[in-house]
């Protein structure tokens, strides 16, 4: 597995930071009907059981917000990806269907409340560190303008920052040419809750993305 560590700066600011990691080979393609139906089922369940005002109190979302706030980020203006996905679903806007990898990200976020990110390892340069981005740091977002990642717990390689619980960079995004990925589950309540989630994520990657050569670890 690619070398991944958590910076002392992040650990000092949020001691319960833990990163669930799955590295594997995959086949990127449009999502199957089975995966789409599974997502539709989960979306219906959420719409029947939650209201928008309750999203920020969901345990994993609340922990992500608490960490980002502790690092100095305005969590009302900059929502984490799981929170934003929940809001979109409860507003009846559905989700964006991009490819099976992106949809597995959505599946895991919607069933757990954890923010996730998946990265094309062929575009990641060298070792990875989960760190706190400094004030004023930006990177080109995926199909969007530059993203302000200052004061966020963000992944960086030997070139620059490329991912965080809010929004990922265009540089390392998954495309139809991607074969080797790193999927990360951003945890802020210690390693223990990630164990079961990683198991379910691995099953989903194998079922929907034909994942192979899989390595799983938790960095805390």
Regions found by a protein language model. Name each.
Residues 1-220:
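Charge-biased, low-complexity intrinsically disordered regions
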């Amino acid at each position: 597995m690619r070398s991944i560590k958590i910076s002392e700066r992040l650990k000092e600011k949020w001691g319960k930071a833990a990163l669930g990691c799955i590295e594997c080979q995959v086949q990127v393609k449009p999502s199957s009907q089975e995966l789409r139906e599974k997502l539709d089922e989960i979306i219906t369940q959420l719409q029947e059981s939650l209201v928008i005002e309750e999203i920020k109190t969901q345990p994993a979302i609340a922990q992500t917000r608490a960490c980002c706030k502790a690092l100095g980020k305005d969590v009302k203006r900059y929502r984490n990806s799981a929170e934003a996905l929940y809001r979109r679903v409860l507003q009846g806007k559905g989700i964006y269907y991009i490819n099976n990898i992106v949809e597995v990200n959505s599946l895991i976020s919607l069933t757990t409340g954890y923010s996730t990110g998946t990265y094309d390892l062929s575009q990641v340069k060298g070792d990875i560190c989960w760190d706190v981005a400094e004030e004023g740091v930006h990177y080109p977002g995926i199909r969007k303008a530059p993203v302000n990642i200052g004061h966020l717990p963000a992944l960086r390689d030997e070139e620059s920052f490329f991912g965080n619980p809010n929004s990922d960079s265009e540089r390392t995004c998954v495309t139809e040419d991607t074969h080797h990925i790193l999927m990360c589950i951003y945890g802020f309540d210690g390693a223990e809750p990630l164990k079961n989630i990683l198991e379910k994520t691995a099953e989903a990657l194998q079922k929907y993305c034909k994942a192979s050569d899989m390595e799983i670890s938790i960095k805390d």
